């Protein structure tokens, strides 16, 4: 069997807890007015079966999502075993409270720098994406 054909399938987010716990930069896809896709690197956290992304309220991603709430996000490893997850669905937008901003900033920048970033008091929007569809992969058995 070729390497691609042996990929483990039917994975769930629970199978990928280690991956989702890592501070990997995700890619968020939103739709422009003309239907083109905008791909944006984002910080995220996986919580309660969905992704939280925080961005400034006036960001282009938020403008897109107000017009069209469909989005996808992908998180993946750049080294073996090349695990990843893609989630698509409709987002909910809300105000990001200080605790969410701090949690995500500390996740990516560490305690001191993340705290300093969060203390700047941004006007942030919380983008919440729960799976409408999910695709996950893991090439561990192939390597």
Predicted features by range, described:
Residues 23-57, 63-65, 71-75, 85-86:
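Short beta-strand segments
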Residues 66-67, 142:
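Short amphipathic alpha-helical segments
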């Amino acid at each position: 069997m070729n390497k691609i054909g042996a990929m483990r399938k039917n994975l769930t987010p629970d199978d990928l807890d280690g991956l989702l716990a890592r501070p990997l930069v995700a890619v968020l896809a939103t739709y422009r007015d003309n239907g083109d896709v905008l791909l944006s690197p984002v910080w995220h956290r996986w919580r309660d079966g969905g992704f939280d992304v925080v961005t400034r309220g006036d960001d282009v991603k938020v403008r897109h999502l107000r017009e069209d709430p469909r989005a996808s996000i992908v998180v993946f490893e750049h080294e073996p075993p090349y695990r990843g997850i893609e989630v698509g669905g409709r987002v909910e937008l809300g105000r990001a409270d200080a605790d969410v901003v701090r949690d995500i900033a500390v996740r990516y920048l560490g305690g001191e720098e993340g705290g300093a970033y969060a203390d700047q008091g941004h006007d942030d929007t919380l983008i919440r994406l729960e799976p409408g569809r999910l695709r996950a992969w893991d090439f561990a058995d192939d390597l």
